[in-house]
Amino acid sequence: MVRSLGCKAHFGTRQEVRNSTMAIKLSIDLSDATFAELSAVIGYAHQLGVDADEKLTFEGTVLNIEFDGDLQFDDVFDAFDEAEIELDNPREDGPIYADDLIDEDEDYRAQTKSQINDEVINEIRDGISSFVDGIVNGLGQGRRGGRYGDFGGPRGPRGPRNDGPFGPFGPFGPGYRGPRF
């Protein structure tokens, strides 16, 4: 199973891979694959030289791309060597799966740490609370004096102008006209 792609890729046995001509079979289960995973498999097949007229085969919900490649061992696995990925459980005689080549600690799907910033959440909460408090205070005063609460805006000569933090362009407008809705 290709864990980073969410699909199975079978490249043949190690002995088959070492031959100059080999059959390559890329498979992906479409029942739980994403568009990105499908694109990755097709992109990899394209990089390996699959002819654009190559027929696709289905076995249930599994899409198979099989082709003969005139490739060397390094053509297929050079990217794995460059990334310096080591085999966790090498299988000498069986097929090579990408699952063997992916380190679970580096797999982005295995990382479940939430990166929520508490300061941002507190700022959002405080902003919403001050807005709601301003509305509630304004509703409690009614339209007496045209005040709809103090939203932290500038103070005029007769007290708070009730413009809010947006100045005369906010929802409460300039002066004592009240809200614009």
UniProtKB/Swiss-Prot annotation:
Skewed-composition ranges (Gly residues): 143-156, 170-181
Top-level lineage group: Bacteria
Name used for this protein in its record: Uncharacterized protein Cgl2226/cg2444
Region (Disordered): 143-181
Oligomer status and interactors: Has been detected in a cytochrome bc1-aa3 supercomplex; its deletion however leaves complex activity unaffected.
